[in-house]
Design a protein with these regions (language model features):
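Globin-like tetrapyrrole-binding proteins
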Residues: 1-97
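A short, basic/flexible loop-to-alpha-helix module at the beginning of a structural domain
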Residues: 193-197
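Structural and coupling elements of P-loop NTPases
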Residues: 189-191
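Ferredoxin-reductase
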Residues: 90-187
Length: 197
């Protein structure tokens, strides 16, 4: 909602928002956000605006907000498309989710250092420490896949390491807690490509 408001304030000169849009689209690509998801978010956002402002969904005000949202969505979809293409074209790059096998887990207190290798044995994208990466796991007892972003601790030509820190009372959907409590060496999880673009 904040991004839509900022966009509406700078609709005549969206380049003012370039840094913020770069950050948002990088996170979206890491989480594998797809163009069709923008329509769902937009519909929910417009309903929220309608409720908060107590105006009908078919009002001119909501139509104006919808137009601003769609312009912003189109801009972000275009930026994300370029990022996906760049990631896929790099040596070892990919888009979407890729299966990785856990090769080692080192524990230190409430922190876990996971080492993973690509299950398909193919090359992986070279990345530096602190590069954002998303990990997606199955939520126990739910038919749900949940992603969470982490930062790479290290990478080699065929493996990544990322640090998972657990909190005392995690949500049942916390990827960090699920990894710590339910995943072991040899298990498979999914990663998005490190956000090197």
């Amino acid at each position: 909602a904040a991004a839509v408001l900022a966009y509406a304030e700078h609709i005549e000169n969206p380049s003012v928002l370039a840094k913020a849009l770069e950050h948002i689209t990088t996170k979206h690509v890491s989480l594998d956000i797809q163009p069709e998801q923008y329509a769902i978010v937009g519909e929910n956002l417009l309903h929220s605006i309608s409720e908060v402002l107590d105006v009908a969904m078919d009002s001119d005000l909501i139509a104006a907000w919808q137009a601003a949202y769609m312009q912003l969505a189109d801009l972000m979809i275009s930026m994300e498309k370029n990022k996906y293409q760049t990631l896929a074209s790099q040596h070892g790059g990919w888009t979407g989710w890729r299966a990785f096998k856990i090769s080692a887990i080192e524990r230190s207190g409430s922190a876990y250092l996971f080492s993973v290798t690509a299950q398909d044995g193919q090359a992986i994208l070279s990345a530096q420490a602190n590069t954002p990466i998303s990990v997606r796991v199955s939520v126990p007892e739910q038919e749900l896949l949940q992603p969470q972003q982490f930062k790479l601790s290290a990478s080699t030509e065929n493996s990544y390491q990322f640090l998972v820190e657990c909190v005392a009372e995690p949500s049942p959907y916390s990827v960090a807690a699920i990894l710590a409590q339910h995943y072991d060496v040899g298990d498979v999880l999914e990663l998005s490509a490190p956000m090197t673009v």
